[in-house]
C-alpha cells in the first residue's frame, strides 16, 4: 500500500474505490464524512500535523500544519492553517516538536482531543538527520551473494524484482552506491537528489 490512499481509507473508513483516492496523483474529496468530523461533532478538538499528501486542504480539523506534497527532510515547508511556513531542522524533529507544542499550548485543555501525527520519515528518499551522517562511516556492508540472482526456475520472483528495479533506484532510494561508484543512479533521479541537498543549510 502507499501512504496517500492508506490515509484516505483511515480517514473515511472506506476502501479506495469508494472514497475516490486510489493513488497519489488523485485529489481527496474533503466533503465526504471522516472520523475527525464525527469527533468534532462530539466536542473533540482535532488536529493533523505532518505528512498529508492528499492534494486538497484538510477538513474536519480545528488545526492543521502539514507538509507540502511529499515534504522535504531538511528545512521543510509546511502549510499551517492555509499559510506557508518554512521551518529549519530535520522533518522528524520539526514535526514532533509541532505536535508537542500543540498538545501543550495549542489546544483547549478542557476538551478531549484527536491528534493525527504523520511523519515524513517512512517515505522515500529516507534521508537521515544530519547528526547521523557519519553513524556508519567506518562500516562496510558487503552485498550478499544472492544480490545478483539469475532467478533460475523462479519466474514470478524475477518479475517482482523487475518491478522493484523499475520503481526503486539503488542510489536514490536504497543508498547502495559503493566506494568504487559501480552502482549508478538513474539520471532523472540525480536532479531530484540535488534538490533535496540544496534545501539544506550550508553548514
What are these model-predicted stretches?
Residues 1-203:
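Formylglycine-dependent sulfatase
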